[in-house]
């Protein structure tokens, strides 16, 4: 290129740089340049939407045509070629799986896990996938062989123990096949199954009756034999029939047969609701035991109880709260009480329950201090055959498929045998059969009492020998199996039932006893606690039994047991403490413990050796009623005529459990207590036609008559809905919350009036226009903005007083006339009761109530409550 050409091109570039229209144009290349996008408009958007809809419709039609084609043409029944292809495909898959399992045994375990129900396979597969993601094939294979495979074997054993031979026989009946998969069912499925079981029991009753009721001459024993046949069918389902112990056949019956219990028992066995409760409880327990078998209830998974059971308990608590909030209690006078307030004021409130127990334990401590007794803390654990999972989360090889309920029954039986051994043998007044005495005789075979020897005509050898010490005699009696408490050892205290991390029950006991009897009681209790499977302990009995003498210098017995009471109720004051067994907060564990106790029906707390606490509650209730009736009288005015009974009442009213025990007769058997709980038969029948027993009040053997503490009878009814409020919430702008927070202007105006009356000179923002409000808000400081936000959030709820339906005078006259036509008085009291949401009994178990401006009659309360 010449110098002139270069100068011309430079001039051209300068001109192009000066004027954009004079620059070179870009070459057109459709493969590299993006396509020009049309400008967006309403029409283009509409066209795009139509195109998308057409595309979706085309896809839907193609999918539908494929489904129709596969259903009517390419299926096994219509196309033999397709059937052969499907069979070949299944056979090839089975062969491939067999080859894989032959070369890789872990595939067999995975296939077995996948074949389990969802509540078993899903959590296990999550753990298997976690180990697979670690990238350690040997650890993954070892986990499958050493943990998952034993879990599946234990699961099969648990299922075999749950499905007994009689249970399988009942499942063979038509329609009852669902009994075999009871743990896998939902609530709706269990309800349907319970209806079928109730129908089967009805058919059994009809078959058992036959021509029995064709004549009027039917003997009660024949009716009982009919009941036996229905009860036998119920026992096949591992369900104990109602009143079974009182009605069953006994060889040596001391009391006459209560034939009046047969109708109520039959009504329950023929009721679908009764069967639903039994089957649902059985389903939950079986499902939980299956989860325990596969190690899903442990410190490594979910401590104490499965997460599914905790979730169910939360939902049950939520439904209970909704039920309490939607119902109220109404008495004969028309007075109403909110049911939620009543429940929170009772012992169902965890705080009240904890306070009452702490007061009782404090009373025991004061009694022990006065008597000079010592306090010992015991811990008793079940043998290893009751524990399903080890501390490391692996299956326990010594577990014998024992359930949580069986572990609780083991401890109850052990404790009953121990207490029986502590009772004095009647008729014995000597050394080993009565109170210890240093006056004894010596036999050639050992030591015995004179009275027993005379009764049995045993040869006595009266010798003047040196008598052994009391300690030597105690140790000899224990080793000889005499359970030396034949000497009448006395103790009292409280026991707490707690779960291990795998749900197995263990006990903590706070016991008070005489100092001289501590060693004998401890040795006797250790003997009963370790007598089963003794060989697995060796010389160390600590894993099964522990005892610790409470040192007053370190802490009182009440302070020692307070932790165990709190962490088994609501975890109050234990948020900062961590459980050594689970590694979680004790307050968080309280929810799991409550769900565990509710599911397995384990009694968490039990006092023994002291007067009953129900009479203590009734006395406190009586004292409160008397205080309201006395009014302005002096507080020291006696309530009961007998001074001894009034002293017990005063002690209970003051909340001093120690004084209450002293006034009741100290630590004596219940038959010697001065005040006891009185019961009566309920007047109104239950839904099954029988009459239950309810608490009446108190009674005393030293005076005649009973004192009623439940004179007022309350009925549980559903809260009536205010018609005006319900109509106001039906508009198009009805709020979704309970209180209407819109508009805020009225609320703010009312607040500004209140502030101005108090001398508040803040600016009224409701009278500003948009510009003034904008400037004012941007000029506010952070403190003023926080105050404004708090004022905007402040909405006073509308409090509604006792509800009463509003009707016109004409409607009231119609109501009175209709009441009189039905045989009622039509008085103002009856009208007011109906308008407040109450009801009036109309006979035959029915009740009449007023709703939607008319009288209605049904058995709603009888069926539901």
From Swiss-Prot:
Catalytic residue list: 560 (o-(5'-phospho-dna)-tyrosine intermediate), 564 (o-(5'-phospho-dna)-tyrosine intermediate)
Highest taxon, organism lineage: Bacteria
Chain intervals for the UniProt region annotation (Disordered): 749-783
A molecular function (GO) term: endonuclease activity
Species classification: Bacteria, Pseudomonadati, Pseudomonadota, Gammaproteobacteria, Enterobacterales
TM helices/strands, residue ranges: none
Function noted in UniProt: Possible endonuclease which induces a single-strand cut and initiates DNA replication.
Species of origin: Escherichia coli
UniProt family annotation: Belongs to the phage GPA family.
GO terms (BP aspect): DNA replication
Protein name: Probable replication endonuclease from retron Ec67
Record flagged with keyword Lipid biosynthesis: no
Keywords from the named record: DNA replication, Endonuclease, Hydrolase, Nuclease, Transposable element
Bias (Basic and acidic residues): 751-783
Broad class of enzyme this protein falls into: hydrolase
Hydrolase in keyword set: yes
Enzyme Commission number, as recorded: 3.1.-.-
């Amino acid at each position: 290129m010449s110098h002139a050409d270069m100068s011309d091109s430079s001039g051209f570039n300068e001109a192009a740089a000066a004027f954009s229209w004079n620059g070179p144009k870009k070459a057109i290349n459709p493969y590299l340049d993006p396509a020009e996008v049309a400008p967006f408009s309403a029409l283009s958007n509409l066209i795009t939407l139509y195109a998308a809809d057409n595309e979706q419709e085309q896809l839907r039609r193609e999918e539908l045509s494929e489904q129709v084609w596969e259903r009517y043409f390419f299926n096994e029944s219509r196309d033999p070629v397709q059937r052969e292809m499907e069979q070949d495909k299944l056979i090839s898959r089975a062969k491939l799986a067999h080859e894989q399992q032959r070369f890789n045994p872990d595939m067999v375990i995975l296939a077995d896990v996948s074949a389990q129900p969802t509540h078993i396979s899903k959590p296990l597969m999550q753990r298997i996938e976690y180990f697979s993601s670690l990238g350690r094939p040997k650890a993954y294979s070892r986990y499958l062989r050493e943990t998952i495979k034993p879990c599946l074997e234990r699961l099969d054993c648990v299922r075999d123990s749950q499905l007994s031979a009689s249970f399988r026989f009942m499942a063979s009946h038509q329609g009852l096949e669902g009994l075999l998969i009871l743990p896998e069912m939902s609530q709706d499925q269990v309800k349907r199954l319970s209806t079928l079981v109730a129908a089967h029991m009805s058919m059994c009753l009809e078959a058992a009756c036959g021509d029995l009721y064709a004549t009027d001459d039917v003997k009660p024993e024949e009716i009982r034999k009919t009941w036996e046949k229905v009860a036998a069918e119920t026992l096949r389902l591992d369900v104990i029939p109602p009143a079974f112990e009182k009605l069953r056949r006994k060889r040596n019956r001391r009391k006459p047969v209560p034939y009046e219990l047969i109708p109520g028992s039959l009504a329950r066995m023929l009721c679908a609701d009764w069967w639903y409760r039994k089957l649902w409880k059985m389903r939950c327990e079986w499902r939980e035991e299956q989860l325990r078998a596969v190690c899903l209830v442990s410190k490594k998974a979910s401590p104490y109880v499965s997460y599914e059971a905790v979730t169910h308990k939360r939902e049950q608590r939520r439904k209970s709260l909704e039920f309490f909030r939607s119902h109220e209690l109404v008495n004969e006078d028309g007075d109403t009480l909110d049911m939620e307030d009543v429940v929170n004021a009772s012992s169902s409130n965890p705080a009240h329950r904890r306070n009452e127990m702490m007061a009782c334990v404090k009373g025991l401590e004061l009694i022990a201090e006065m008597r000079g007794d010592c306090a010992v803390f015991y811990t008793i654990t079940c043998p290893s055959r009751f524990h399903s999972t080890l501390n490391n989360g692996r299956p326990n090889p010594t577990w014998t498929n024992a359930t949580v309920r069986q572990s609780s029954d083991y401890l109850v039986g052990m404790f009953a045998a121990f207490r029986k051994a502590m009772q004095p043998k009647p008729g014995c007044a000597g050394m080993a059969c009565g109170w210890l005495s240093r006056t004894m005789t010596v036999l050639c075979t050992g030591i015995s009492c004179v009275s027993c020897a005379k009764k049995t005509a045993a040869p006595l050898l009266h010798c003047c020998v040196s008598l052994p010490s009391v300690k030597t005699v105690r140790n000899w009696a224990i080793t000889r199996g005499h359970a030396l408490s034949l000497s009448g050892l006395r103790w009292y205290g409280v026991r707490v039932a707690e779960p291990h991390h795998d749900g197995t029950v263990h006990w903590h006991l706070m016991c008070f006893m005489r100092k001289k009897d501590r060693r004998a009681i401890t040795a006797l209790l250790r003997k009963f606690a370790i007598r089963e499977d003794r060989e697995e302990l060796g010389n160390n009995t600590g894993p099964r039994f522990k005892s610790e003498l409470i040192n007053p210098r370190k802490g009182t017995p009440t302070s020692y047991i307070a932790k165990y009471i709190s962490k088994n109720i609501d975890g109050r004051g234990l948020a900062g403490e961590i459980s050594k067994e689970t590694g979680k907060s004790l307050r968080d564990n309280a929810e799991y413990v409550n769900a565990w106790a509710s599911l397995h029906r384990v009694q968490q707390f039990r006092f023994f050796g002291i007067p009953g606490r129900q009479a203590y509650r009734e006395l406190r209730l009586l004292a409160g009623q008397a205080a309201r009736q006395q009014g302005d009288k002096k507080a020291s005015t006696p309530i009961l005529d007998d001074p001894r009974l009034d002293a017990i009442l005063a002690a209970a009213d003051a909340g001093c459990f120690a004084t209450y025990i002293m006034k009741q007769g100290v630590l004596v058997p219940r038959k010697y207590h001065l005040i006891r709980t009185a019961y009566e038969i309920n007047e109104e029948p239950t839904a099954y036609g029988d009459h239950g027993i309810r608490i009446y009040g108190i009674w005393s053997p030293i005076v005649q008559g009973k004192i009623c503490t439940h004179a007022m009878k309350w009925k549980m009814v559903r809260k009536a809905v205010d018609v005006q409020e319900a109509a106001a919430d039906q508009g198009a702008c009805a709020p979704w919350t309970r209180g209407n927070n819109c508009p805020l202007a009225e609320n703010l105006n009312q607040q500004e009036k209140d502030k101005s009356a108090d001398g508040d000179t803040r600016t009224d923002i409701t009278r500003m226009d948009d510009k003034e409000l904008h400037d004012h808000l941007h000029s506010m400081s952070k403190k003023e903005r926080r105050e404004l936000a708090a004022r905007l959030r402040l909405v006073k709820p509308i409090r509604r007083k006792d509800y009463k339906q509003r009707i016109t005078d004409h409607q009231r006259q119609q109501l009175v006339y209709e009441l009189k036509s039905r045989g009622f008085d039509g008085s103002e009291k009856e009208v007011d009761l109906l308008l407040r949401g109450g009801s009036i009994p109309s006979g035959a178990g029915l009740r009449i109530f007023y709703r939607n401006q008319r009288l209605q009659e049904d058995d709603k309360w009888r069926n539901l409550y």
